[in-house]
């Protein structure tokens, strides 16, 4: 497995060829195959290798706006909003575990992209969902790109996340969530992006924000923190590219993935939304990796 430190200000832009096709799908109007699955908004643009984009907690598919033009010019890209987020269906309280999110993606692929596989790229919570899907249904997943995904955190970081999880239970998610976001930014992060993240979270249904965070890191079946995360990642057979911001995390995770095409990179001069703080560099890196698969 390769492991690199991307401590660069900017890398050269890809020389892109081809033109993105016109939008071919916008909203899935039918419930996917699994009972209880949500109607998901998604766009389906381009031709070539199938790539699916999953956003993070209290976000939406617009997070990938810096990547979509490049990706859609090279690949077939399905960018979706997870249940309760963006323009997708808001499901009732009690249906926001990682397994619920995975079931939606599984149902979407089997119902609308039968017999097809995807490189699944997820940010934050979306990175963990992508990994869980790869574990449950490797027949649907070619590889995973985890953009600072919710995996591989130390127990010490887990204790910090516990404060947020506890705060979400009784506090105002519109205050608790942005306070966590503040700890995840870099000097490179635009004030406009920070404000957008906060306002978007505050416009997400409160029960969605409250109930989605904790199960990523706590309780039976969590795979985001400590030895449970390591044990889970070691079971994955698909190529896995994890981009993170912490050297100690990268050092831990560099031996966890079995595929020789897997890699773990440390990215400096970026906050948690690496793909927004360093978009050109990220676009080059992910395209180069996907093209090796």
Predicted features and spans:
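Active-site loop/oxyanion-hole signature of alpha/beta-hydrolase fold enzymes
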Residues: 45, 79-121, 125, 129, ...
């Amino acid at each position: 497995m390769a492991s690199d430190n991307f401590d660069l200000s900017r890398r050269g832009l890809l020389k892109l060829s081809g033109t993105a096709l016109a939008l071919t799908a916008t909203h899935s109007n039918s419930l996917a195959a699994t009972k209880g699955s949500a109607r998901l908004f998604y766009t389906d643009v381009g031709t070539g290798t199938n790539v699916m984009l999953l956003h993070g907690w209290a976000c939406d598919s617009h997070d990938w706006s810096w990547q979509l033009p490049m990706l859609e010019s090279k690949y077939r890209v399905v960018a979706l909003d997870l249940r309760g987020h963006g323009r997708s269906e808001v499901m009732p309280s009690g249906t926001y575990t990682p397994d619920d999110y995975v079931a939606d993606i599984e149902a979407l692929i089997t119902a609308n992209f039968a017999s097809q596989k995807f490189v699944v790229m997820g940010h934050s919570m979306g990175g963990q969902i992508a990994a869980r899907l790869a574990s449950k249904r490797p027949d649907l997943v070619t590889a995973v790109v985890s953009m600072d995904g919710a995996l591989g955190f130390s127990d010490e970081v887990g204790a910090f996340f516990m404060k947020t999880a506890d705060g979400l239970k009784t506090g105002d998610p519109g205050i608790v969530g942005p306070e966590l976001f503040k700890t995840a930014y870099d000097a490179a992060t635009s004030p406009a992006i920070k404000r957008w993240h906060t306002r978007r979270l505050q416009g997400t249904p409160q029960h969605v924000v409250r109930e989605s965070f904790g199960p990523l890191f706590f309780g039976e079946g969590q795979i985001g923190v400590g030895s449970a995360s390591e044990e889970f990642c070691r079971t994955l057979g698909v190529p896995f590219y994890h981009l993170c911001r912490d050297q100690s995390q990268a050092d831990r995770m560099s031996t966890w993935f079995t595929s020789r095409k897997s890699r773990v990179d440390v990215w400096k001069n970026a906050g948690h939304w690496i793909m927004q703080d360093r978009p050109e560099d990220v676009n080059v890196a992910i395209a180069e990796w996907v093209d090796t698969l």
